[in-house]
Amino acid sequence: MPNETNVNIGNAGEYFVAGELERRGFTVAVPMSNVKDFDILAIDRETHKQIAIQVKTTGYKQKKWTLSKKNENLIGDDIFYIFVSLNELDTPEYHIVPSKIVANTIKESHNKWLETPGKKGQKHNNTNIRVFLDNEDLFFDK
């Protein structure tokens, strides 16, 4: 079970994203309880296009987010991840990534990690943990 600080950081990220989407012309619904696979549902007020959003948040000035193996299979044309860096007291940063790119990236990087020897030359054990990095700001929303 996640600790209270992580839950608060996650909730803050979801509400920052919801506010930003509203500001950009979307009508947003944030479910009151956990919904499998999605944190936010949004509808473009002009086109009426609907999208589902998975929000992942870090409270630090880093561009690394933890996911799980199940995220390798969460793929759809209308599914997006918004990775949030709360940056402590600075303005949050948003990295917007289509689900297909996230799924492929975390699968490839995990397989590469498994093939790379550990610090002492040992083989890595397979886990359900996956990591998404955007150190080069390829998906940074300016």
Question: Model-predicted segments: where are they?
Answer:
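Mixed-charge (Asp/Glu-Lys/Arg
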Residues: 1-36, 41-142
